[in-house]
Amino acid sequence: LYDIGSGCLLDTSEFDMTHEPTVQESVAAGVDLTFFSCDKLLGGPQAGVILGKKELISRLADHPLARAVRIDKLNLTALASTLIHYVKGEALTQIPIWRMISAPIEELKARVFRWHQSLTASSEIIQGYSTIGGGSLPGQTMPTWLLAIPGNGNKYSAAEIAKRLRRSDYPVIARIESDLSLIHISEP
């Protein structure tokens, strides 16, 4: 039995990150049953997969609890759609987590610059880091460019700015550091 956690299908070391065990490595190693999440680095719906030897999967499917924990049709469709992107070699362009991870640093800077130009509030562009996620690659960070809105240069504190951003018609989540509301522009 092997719980690989994130359900990663791509080699994270190709993106200057710590190597995360992949589903393919587990299967190639002959593990009887591999468990992994469908969200996180896989980029699909929140669900779990048990992958393994046919006779063991059959025994699990026959268990009375199998019906209670099986995936529903909507999540199964979402998972299938996600996996199709991997099969077609489109994961880096079609799956948001991989689009964010693989975005060139220059592209991130250009996005932040566009936001910076459109703001009426005092802001600056600074270098920083982004975390990948708590459940996948814990503690792993990547260099990025951030839009920094200072609390002391505006009418509100950084915490108040972050609160207003979260409650806006198009919510934006900011990280607060040193009285700055930091915004990572990960999607165009």
Residue ranges and their predicted role:
Residues 181-188:
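Residue-level detector of conserved catalytic or cofactor/ligand-binding positions
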Residues 75-76, 80-133:
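Conserved PLP-dependent catalytic core of the aminotransferase class-I/II
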Residues 52, 149-153, 186:
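Short beta-strand-to-loop capping motifs
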Residues 5-6, 55-61, 87-97, 139-143, ...:
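Short acidic (Asp/Glu) and glycine-rich catalytic loops that position anionic groups and cofactors
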Residues 16-19, 53, 68, 72-76, ...:
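Generic structural signal for well-ordered, non-membrane alpha-helical segments
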Residues 1-86, 120:
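Conserved PLP-enzyme active-site core in the AAT-like
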Residues 118-178:
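Catalytic-core signal marking the mid-to-C-terminal active-site face
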